[in-house]
């Protein structure tokens, strides 16, 4: 079984400003309501150390592999629980230029034998956490763009 979660938000900032927020992993604890910590190099093939905690949920640490890190456009990684096929997630942040700035798309495709057991929690806790993170990225990117413009 597979489950796809998908959110997007329009941001009044250039794609590079949105990327600057997403790629500044050391700053995550100061602003990110979902990914509380993230360490590592944003380059294909590299492993990250990520601690997630949706509101009302338990903290979970995992070590995803970066699949793509294209500045101003996309950050994508794959994480696994235990072994391939048990519970896998491919997470993607895509940044699209719009006439007024950018659109941030955040999505994750979950596959594996545990998906049916975890689907309800993913929909009720993880999807709102994506939306909260999108709002926080928007706030931070727009604040950074306003500073740069002054």
Annotate each PLM feature.
Residues 45-49:
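Short coil-to-beta transition motif at edge beta-strands of beta-rich domains
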Residues 103-105, 109-150:
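A conserved amphipathic terminal alpha-helix motif
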């Amino acid at each position: 079984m597979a489950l796809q979660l998908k959110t997007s938000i329009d941001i009044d900032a250039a794609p590079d400003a949105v990327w600057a927020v997403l790629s500044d992993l050391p700053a995550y604890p100061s602003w990110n309501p979902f990914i509380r910590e993230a360490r590592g190099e944003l380059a294909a093939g590299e492993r990250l150390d990520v601690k997630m905690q949706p509101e009302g949920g338990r903290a979970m640490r995992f070590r995803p592999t970066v699949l793509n890190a294209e500045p101003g456009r996309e950050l994508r990684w794959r994480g696994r629980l235990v072994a391939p096929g048990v519970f896998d997630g491919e997470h993607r942040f895509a940044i699209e230029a719009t006439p007024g700035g950018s659109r941030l798309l955040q999505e994750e495709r979950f596959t594996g034998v545990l998906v049916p057991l975890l689907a309800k929690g993913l929909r009720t806790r993880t999807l709102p956490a994506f939306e909260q993170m999108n709002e926080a990225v928007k706030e931070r990117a727009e604040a950074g763009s306003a500073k740069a413009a002054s």
